[in-house]
Amino acid sequence: MINALSNRSGYPCLSQNIYLNQASLGLLSDKTVTEMTKFLDTVARYGNLKMTDEEEAHFLNPLRRNVATLLQAKQKNIAIVASASEILSQIPELCKPKRNSKVILVSTDFPAITRPWLGSAKTRGFEICFVHEIPEADLTQSLIEKIDSNTSIVCVSYVQFASGTRIDVKELSQHTKKMGVKLVIDVTQAAGAIPININDWDLDILVCSGYKWLGGHGGIAIGWLSDEILELEPPTIGWFGNENPFEMDATKLNLSKTAAKYTQSTLSYISVVGLNAAIEQLLEISILEIMKHSDKLAQQLFSNLLYSEWKSFRPITSREFSSHIISLMHPSGDAIKSTFEQLSENGLICGIRNGRLRVSISHYNNGNDIKYLGAALHHE
């Protein structure tokens, strides 16, 4: 049997349930919860008795260091914010696409990525070009084919939340760079599950939520901004983005020269502590080993489903296949809903996205989880 990479006892719900849904609301480990509770009990409840202004001004630094390690980036380029949408919603104003130029999006991407552009297009007058993802086509190539001299921005997820399709960001970034097109990548469904080296990509902005594969709680997210983007002022400025947030002269603006200027205000510090602990745990396990683990379990699942009616949106042989998010199709749409409900009743939690069964494989999953899922799907 394929054993879990992490200690399953650190996730109490796994004693009674099979959780294949980290792509939605991710599980929090005992270590993460312990650190969050410790902070709440020993610091947060005591206000400034336990945290001075100077300590608060530097409170995000440990998380910033770990995020930089995770992405193999420089700390000065790392932004800590309350949500991925906090950055995504500013990008249309930050990048200012020209009137009548083209912004390329994926029509089935997560709405947080597309909706800021849809709203901005009404007033800025640029064109939205939706690329449609289909199983028979390579999504990376479909995106590249739409890039032309009139394109201003490409904004897309590294891994699609519903299908698990993983685009080739390096290849895409080579084309956007050549054409003078800005590239924005959301790695929410990738960071923590597959290795990311920001130096391999030539992009402008990266964003990521903290409550899925990174193992944190809601209310905290991360971003990376290129040196070129850092030369610009954030469209939305908060008090905490100042070089020294606690210099309280309300008549002066002295923004940080780093991505710290994107932190707008007091964050959920308990979520900061939780995400920092969760990322430390992931780094200890090794992101590469986590990816290899999901590869093995995905292979097991495909072997179990070999003679069933269930088929993956992306075949395992596809270069765009992601082993940690598997989107399963069935000839009968009713079978998908009924199977999902039956699995849930029996304590196996997965998801339905875009009319398909979505299976998320994490480091705490083992061969028995996949065996149970395979057997249940064969009964349909």
Regions flagged by a language model, labelled:
Residues 1-380:
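Pyridoxal 5′-phosphate
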